[in-house]
């Protein structure tokens, strides 16, 4: 692999291309997440239409149906909507755990110089929206402040679905930045959920959960992918984490962290983490997340006082955090990084491109809705939170589309250049002749 460290005295380029293997991996992720984002949008639209139709009562009845009333002893007498949030999203977070470990072991995040930009941007994109939300809700205080983390999340599947719709050929360096930013964003979201949105904490079940997680890790470290052993261990780990009061999706992340990234034998084409990610990402993007979106997005606006909704400090804080906070946090932190270091934008990238990507990061659908449910579960603000997340994400998507559509011609020129392979060795020329 070509050394990407710039020579002394040369400015480091922000959003430069990754290596060719990393580019191929990102392309595979993009295809799956874009398709999944389309299904996510479809699920959300169906839920909204159904919940606001004359048959809205049947939607509510379906979401509140408890398939296993006898599971109360294990606290598993959950309705379908909760099973989607706690159960199916564990698959999503398992893939996130695999992705995180891969990025830190073999991806861009293993290099501190390349990791600095997405990490700083993700932190900025978390702090500023949270501050905006707190600022708006500070006078209200009390329960309102529990929602501070709602506008801090980015939904990469939704963002990529928007990109697919507007047809933008986003440069490879920016695609890598957007995906890596989302990975770091997911890590921060997992940390926030585990620390700030834990219910009645019980230490014993959490300690017991370490046993099936350790056995799961022992098997995968030895490359034993017996589904009849791994899936029951994962279910037991999920059940114990759920019983502990920590949100059950954290079990998915911990299981993902145990999977080895590097190839075990010389003949292996891929590490086990990449293999499992390739197998489970379609399940996550094509089923788990769309079903969660279907149950989470069904907010009924019939009979609602729209004036009261749009002036609710919770709604204003979430929308402002997603639309303004993400842009100020990501764009601002990147600008400051370039301003106070020798870093500069890659030749193919403009600050307008970064503005569009920063707006895309304001689409905070899946994890924002999840945090909203944890912060205001069963409360009067629950529907307002859903409406705010949907509204803020829609505004961010529209603004990003306006900015990025104007750059389409330039994107196409870059895309053509990134496909040129003059010596026909299967590796485009731009990945062989990079000046960092």
UniProtKB/Swiss-Prot annotation:
One of its GO terms (cellular component) is plasma membrane. It catalyses: Na(+)(in) + 2 H(+)(out) = Na(+)(out) + 2 H(+)(in). NCBIfam families: NhaA (TIGR00773). The keyword Nuclease does not apply. The gene is nhaA1. The keyword S-adenosyl-L-methionine does not apply. Keywords: Antiport, Cell membrane, Ion transport, Membrane, Sodium, Sodium transport, Transmembrane, Transmembrane helix, Transport. GO terms for molecular function: sodium:proton antiporter activity. Its main location: membrane. The lineage of its organism: Bacteria, Bacillati, Actinomycetota, Actinomycetes, Micromonosporales. It holds the Pfam family Na_H_antiport_1. This is Na(+)/H(+) antiporter NhaA 1. One of its GO terms (biological process) is regulation of pH. Belongs to the NhaA Na(+)/H(+) (TC 2.A.33) antiporter family. The chain crosses the membrane at residues 35-55, 80-100, 116-136, 147-167, 176-196, 201-221, 226-246, 283-303, 313-333, 354-374, 385-405. Gene3D superfamilies: Na+/H+ antiporter like domain. Na(+)/H(+) antiporter that extrudes sodium in exchange for external protons. It is a multi-pass membrane protein. InterPro entries: Na/H_antiporter_dom_sf, NhaA. It is found in: Cell membrane.
